[in-house]
Curated annotation (Swiss-Prot):
Pfam families per UniProt: PEPCK_ATP
BP GO terms, sorted: gluconeogenesis
Pathway in which this enzyme or protein is active: Carbohydrate biosynthesis; gluconeogenesis
Residues that bind Mn(2+): 212, 231, 268
Gene: pckA
Biological source species: Cronobacter sakazakii (strain ATCC BAA-894) (Enterobacter sakazakii)
Classification lineage: Bacteria, Pseudomonadati, Pseudomonadota, Gammaproteobacteria, Enterobacterales
Chemical reaction(s) catalysed: oxaloacetate + ATP = phosphoenolpyruvate + ADP + CO2
Record's protein name: Phosphoenolpyruvate carboxykinase (ATP)
Residues the record lists as binding ATP: 212, 231, 247-255, 296, 332, 448-449, 454
Length: 539
């Protein structure tokens, strides 16, 4: 048995016994050879593409499985967590008994015992004083590759004294036969224990469960320290001006923050502390459906050796059909952040944000492409988190459907949404930041607003020209809309212009306004929440 960097005793402490071999923190060349090994079968085996990146399939699990997510309810979490069975807000934080946790842990450790394992030690969080040291344990080479791409890679010196704060054991090949007797959703599980500081994965091969699992943990720990934890991308301009982009999967966080005129801090998960905005990750996880070199050159060129593609269609000659959504709309690529040339170096962090952008993909075609928010509207729309749940980011979702996701990331919140709102508002007020609502979705034509127009809108926000523009108020929603912006077709700025008649817009707008009002009722049981009702659409 060969073991490098970790001992059998380390693994026995987790319940993993009789290991054949540990491949500890392998380099990219090793992972490349391992995942292309012709003796591998099924979802373990990767395919080489003509761009140099390896592609893998994740089976039926082409997105997260929120219905299979559980958190142990014990003395650590009982009074702090936002539980699915407590209060008005709907969420995925289903309680798990310590007894069922022990059963699931036994299944995963049994699966990993006696195997050849890949172990990756990495950091979550770019700031040493608040980062998590995470140990990922898996028997699948490409899953190790995924976390090596997505998390912050320690230096050799940092690895020498590495003590994990959190353990992730991925037993994708095992399932739970006793799920019905235990009152669970299915044989698959993604379970967390905040006391043991551990995540267990069973049944699902989707790599994003490891990424979003650690994001959920940061979302638990940081706000309790007064640090904002945000589902957003972030970049910084030449003058040090920082912008953050909130939004659910597929609304444009990665695309819009990857800007040749600005340096990327990160594309999905960030904190905001006394020093400024910092990335949680060491990589990017971009959607690739209908990707083209012309429309998104930075992401396209990041797909090369060491990138890892998921669920794309690879032709016999190794070329990729990015337009093929037969497996899923949620085709993805993970790559280390340095595959993007224009990034903040050497550490993915910058100063305080002055521009806060809420991205929404409005399936109704009601909201304007851009509006400038007041302070109370900022809180209202942050807590509402309206968007369309875009096809494929969760299993079973194939058509755009309207949804409300608190803080633009309810699936990853472990505390009540108002706790995130309070911390964000404090950070924004201290920095003098301004918020904007940007619709990257549809309008009355039935077509999606073009990336070209959205980029011109983002430019106007970042260079200050939107703040100087004349505005008018959109009825019902009371949103301040610019009358004109450089490089943007003026006719689309007022969504009513994209309908055959203003009455058609009014009808859809009343429908959407009612959805906003109904959704926000869950926050009206507190004085602070009730005070924000007037900042939203009115009947």
């Amino acid at each position: 048995m060969r073991v490098t960097g970790i001992t059998p005793q380390d693994l026995k402490a987790y319940g993993i016994n009789d290991i054949q071999e540990v491949v500890y923190n392998p380099d990219y060349d090793t992972l490349y050879r391992e995942e292309l090994d012709p003796s591998l079968e099924g979802y373990e085996r990767g395919v080489l593409t003509d761009l140099g990146a390896v592609a893998v399939d994740t089976g039926i699990f082409t997105g997260r499985s929120p219905k299979d997510k559980y958190i142990v309810r014990d003395d650590t979490t009982r009074d702090t967590l936002w539980w699915s069975d407590n209060g008005k807000g709907k969420n995925d934080n289903k309680p798990l008994t310590p007894e069922t946790w022990q059963h699931l842990k036994g299944l995963v450790t049994q699966q990993l015992s006696g195997k050849r394992l890949f172990i990756i030690d990495a950091f979550c969080g770019a700031n040493p004083d608040s980062r998590l040291s995470v140990r990922f344990i898996t028997e699948v080479a490409w899953q190790a590759h995924f976390v090596k791409n997505m998390f912050i890679r320690p230096s050799d010196d940092e690895l020498e004294g590495f003590e994990p704060d959190f353990i992730v054991m991925n037993g994708a090949k095992c399932t739970n036969p006793d799920w019905q007797a235990q009152g669970l959703n299915s044989e698959n599980f993604v379970a967390f224990n905040l006391t043991e500081r551990m995540q267990l994965i069973g049944g699902t091969w989707y790599g994003g469960e490891m990424k979003k699992g650690m994001f959920s943990i940061m979302n638990y720990l940081l706000p309790l320290k007064g640090i904002a934890s945000m589902h957003c991308s972030a970049n910084v301009g030449e003058k040090g001006d920082v912008a953050v982009f909130f939004g659910l999967s597929g609304t444009g966080k990665t695309t819009l923050s990857t800007d040749p005129k600005r340096r990327l801090i990160g594309d999905d998960e960030h904190g905001w502390d006394d020093d400024g905005v910092f990335n949680f990750e060491g990589g990017c996880y971009a959607k690739t459906i209908r990707l083209s070199e012309e429309a998104e050159p930075d992401i396209y060129h990041a797909i090369r050796r060491d990138a890892l593609l998921e669920n794309v269609t690879v032709r016999d000659d190794g070329s990729i059909d990015f337009d093929d959504a037969s497996k899923t709309e949620n085709t993805r690529v993970s790559y280390p952040i340095y595959h993007i040339d224009n990034i903040v170096k050497p550490v993915s962090k910058a100063g305080h944000a002055t521009k806060v952008i809420f991205l929404t993909a409005d399936a109704f075609g009601v909201l304007p492409p851009v509006s400038r928010l007041t302070a109370s509207q900022t809180q209202y729309h942050f807590l509402s988190g309206f968007t369309a749940k875009l096809a494929g980011t969760e299993r079973g979702v194939t058509e755009p459907t309207p949804t409300f996701s608190a803080c633009f990331g309810a699936a990853f919140l472990m505390l009540h949404p108002t706790q995130y709102s309070e911390v964000l508002v404090k950070r924004m007020q201290a920095a003098g930041a301004q918020a904007y609502l940007v619709n990257t979705g549809w309008n009355g034509t039935g077509k999606r607003i073009s990336i070209k127009d959205t980029r011109a809108i983002i430019d106007a926000i970042l260079n200050g020209s939107l703040d100087d523009a004349e505005t008018f108020t959109l009825p019902l929603f009371n949103l301040a809309i610019p009358t004109s912006l450089p490089g943007v077709d003026e006719r689309i700025l007022d969504p009513r212009n994209t309908y055959a008649s203003p009455e058609q817009w009014q009808e859809k707008a009343q429908q959407l306004a009612q959805l906003f009002i109904s959704n926000f009722e869950k926050y009206t049981d507190t004085p602070a929440g009730a005070a924000l009702v007037s900042a939203g659409p009115q009947r």
